[in-house]
């Protein structure tokens, strides 16, 4: 006689005994043949119900009849109690994500007309427990349902048992418990029925995270496992990846794989800056099955491959974009800012020009305080006329001190120019002044009219 015990979840209800809940609550529980009517899902609950016909008529093991297992005992006060029954039932809720089923009806559902499985897009976790002759092995099936149709019907058949040295089919194994417990993970997707025959792996060993399942004794039966056709997705836990283990994925035929949706940064794990690097290779023992090994890498252990560029998933920026440019400096066009050339500044017309800085910064700088070294002069340009007597100041306030300095510099410059002039220019200027006077005096002494009249023939 087998019974089911729901695994206590982090949000398990703290009720001393099992009580029926209304449809507005977080979960609905259907049990027995009397409660077989088809129930429709609410916003946060799902009911799975299986028939108990064949389970009650099957013979039971004598060891189990004599000594009921520990799962028959009432559960703790922290979780809901499980009632012993000849068959099994499925119970799923979004709060606990716990599904239980009897050992005799392991992974077997009726036709869609008998029990309709209606669920939301939330993850549905189903766990089964079965006691053996000499040891206990626990197999849990974790299914993540993602699809366009809210109603998915699947019919799973129990796999066959192996003989001496037999081992449970390890198509999807992960999270081995210390008590030699094997768990299988699968993704179920689709609106049609899925029927998967049992897999016989033979001597194929399954890679697991903690330990491998050792062969049982000759008289021990291996646990019955269920295999569904999952999408081509890798179902590994972070605990298995940290241990450096490998998990196996079964290829899907005609099933569209949807990525898992994440709602927050903490759920996606981007703030931890951890990633999973997956290497897949085809195995020789299983044709059509790929062995995928996942390795965990962090910020310290990241070794980029040659020719590859790693970018942050959240900001989509690489480390080279944020690092200072060493090989190729950034230009103004890369940043999208057109930097105008800095013109040479002059305090006054006679002062030496200030050289522009050698390198222009790409982005504009904002300075709140004025530095004492780069104080601009209030006088930008001083223009003098030709005589040097009038002046105009542009772009500066009229200040007596500034004007006095400008006039003094202008007079000093003119004095230096007069001293540099050679003395020959002075002599030439004196001779140039005397030349016209001498020409006038000579013309007066010798009148041309008289000379011309006397010299002219009659």
UniProtKB/Swiss-Prot annotation:
**Protein's GO biological process:** neuron projection development
Q: In which tissues is it expressed?
A: Expressed specifically in the cerebellum.
Q: Ranges of Basic and acidic residues compositional bias?
A: 31-41
Q: Name one GO cellular component term.
A: plasma membrane
- The ranges of region (Disordered) come to 1-94, 118-172
Instruction: Give me the stretches of Low complexity compositional bias.
Output: 14-30
**Record's Pfam families?**
GRIN_C (PF15235)
Q: Which PANTHER family match?
A: G PROTEIN-REGULATED INDUCER OF NEURITE OUTGROWTH 2, G PROTEIN-REGULATED INDUCER OF NEURITE OUTGROWTH C-TERMINAL DOMAIN-CONTAINING PROTEIN
Quaternary structure, per UniProt, is:
Interacts with activated forms of GNAO1 and GNAZ.
Q: What does this protein do?
A: May be involved in neurite outgrowth.
Protein name, entry field? G protein-regulated inducer of neurite outgrowth 2
Species for this entry: Homo sapiens
Query: Which gene codes for it?
Result: GPRIN2
């Amino acid at each position: 006689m087998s019974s089911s015990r729901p695994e206590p979840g982090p949000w398990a209800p703290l009720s001393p005994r099992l009580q029926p809940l209304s449809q507005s609550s977080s979960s609905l529980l259907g049990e027995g043949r009397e409660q077989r009517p088809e129930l429709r899902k609410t916003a946060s609950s799902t009911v799975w119900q299986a028939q108990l016909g064949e389970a009650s008529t099957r013979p039971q093991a004598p060891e189990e009849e004599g000594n009921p297992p520990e799962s028959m005992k009432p559960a703790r006060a922290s979780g809901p109690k499980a009632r012993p029954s000849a068959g099994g039932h499925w119970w799923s809720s979004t709060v606990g994500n716990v599904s239980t089923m009897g050992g005799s009806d392991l992974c077997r559902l009726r036709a869609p007309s008998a029990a309709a499985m209606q669920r939301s897009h939330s993850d549905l976790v189903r766990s089964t427990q079965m006691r053996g002759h000499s040891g206990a092995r626990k197999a849990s099936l974790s299914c993540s349902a993602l699809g366009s149709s809210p109603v998915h019907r699947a019919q799973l058949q129990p796999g066959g048992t192996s003989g001496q040295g037999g081992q449970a089919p390890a198509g999807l194994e992960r999270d081995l418990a210390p008590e030699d417990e094997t768990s299988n993970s699968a993704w179920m997707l689709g609106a049609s029925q899925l029927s998967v025959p049992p897999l016989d792996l033979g001597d194929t060993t399954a890679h697991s995270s903690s330990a491998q399942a050792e062969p049982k004794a000759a008289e021990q039966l291996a646990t019955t496992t269920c295999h569904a056709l999952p999408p081509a997705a890798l179902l590994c836990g972070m605990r298995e990846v940290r241990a450096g283990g490998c998990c196996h994925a079964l290829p899907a035929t005609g099933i569209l794989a949807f990525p898992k949706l994440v709602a927050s940064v903490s759920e996606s794990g981007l703030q931890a800056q951890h990633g999973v690097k997956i290497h897949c290779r085809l195995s020789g023992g299983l044709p059509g099955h790929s062995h995928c090994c996942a390795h965990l890498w962090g910020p310290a252990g990241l070794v980029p491959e040659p020719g590859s560029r790693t970018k942050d998933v959240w900001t989509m920026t690489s480390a080279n974009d944020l690092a200072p440019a060493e090989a190729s400096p950034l230009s103004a066009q890369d940043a999208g800012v057109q930097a105008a050339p800095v013109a040479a500044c002059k305090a006054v017309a006679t002062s030496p020009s200030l050289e522009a800085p050698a390198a222009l910064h790409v982005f504009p700088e904002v300075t709140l305080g004025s530095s004492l070294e780069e104080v601009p002069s209030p006088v930008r340009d001083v223009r003098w006329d030709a005589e040097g007597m009038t002046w105009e100041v542009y772009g500066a306030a009229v200040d007596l001190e500034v004007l006095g300095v400008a006039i003094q510099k202008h007079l000093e410059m003119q004095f230096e120019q007069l001293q540099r002039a050679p003395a020959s220019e002075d002599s030439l200027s004196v001779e140039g002044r005397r030349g016209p006077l001498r020409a006038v005096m000579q013309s007066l002494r010798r009148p041309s009219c008289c000379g011309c009249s006397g010299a002219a023939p009659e």
